[in-house]
Amino acid sequence: MDYPLNNQPATDRYDRMQYKYCGKSGLQLPLISLGLWHNFGSVDNFSVATDMIKYAFDHGITHFDLANNYGPVPGSAETNFGRILKENFQGYRDEMIISSKAGHDMWAGPYGGNSSRKNLMASIDQSLRRTGLEYFDIFYSHRYDGVTPVEETIQTLIDIVKQGKALYIGISKYPPLQARIAYEMMAKAGVPCLISQYRYSMFDRAVEAESLPLAAEH
């Protein structure tokens, strides 16, 4: 760790990272973001998790990506991140892009793991409480569940922005047909889709066929 002795982020942190505009928005994101899917749950070492967040921010990584079911235990990554934020980054919230998602299994019963309005509204309120935040910079529908009408899910995301619980919205792992419906519905409502999150690497380039060109159109 090359954190200063006064435990404050390095003053040259923004010189250590490049940033690009996200889609057609005015929001810049770092070329590298930190996902909290692993290493930040209640079964992990909290001190190590804290050091990772500090090191990332110290090197210009401003985007921290959560989901309500990240852990393990589900929800614990958001809780731990909220604690890290409170204990180490007072005064730096406006320099961070914090995102979360909902749509995978989170609690028992028929309302705890789909993309319905019921689930998404409950989920974002729970996530805000766990993190101690007043809003998320980005909130995603974590998946198309194959049952909930896309229109219901997307209208809920639009309403979440209008309620001030998120600044931007996005989708994750949506098939092309449902993604097109989402993009067009968001644009018509004046709340365009900021970002689409897919599995994409040198070893998995399937999204190049349809999903990436479709996203580029919008």
Predicted regions mapped to residue ranges:
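Short, acidic/polar
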Residues: 43-57, 114-131, 152-155, 179-183
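Structural preference for beta-strand elements that scaffold enzyme active sites
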Residues: 21, 29-33, 62-63, 95-99, ...
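Active-site groove signature of glycoside hydrolases
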Residues: 128-149
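Active-site mouth loops of central-metabolism enzymes
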Residues: 35-47, 106-121, 142-148
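Beta/alpha (TIM)-barrel catalytic core signal, keyed to glycine-rich beta->alpha loops juxtaposed to Asp/Glu
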Residues: 2-16, 144-218
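N-terminal binding-site loop/beta-alpha segment at the start of enzyme catalytic domains
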Residues: 1-96, 162
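Structural motif corresponding to the early beta-alpha repeats
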Residues: 91-115
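Active-site beta-loop-alpha junctions enriched in small/polar residues
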Residues: 37-39, 67-69, 101-105, 141-144, ...
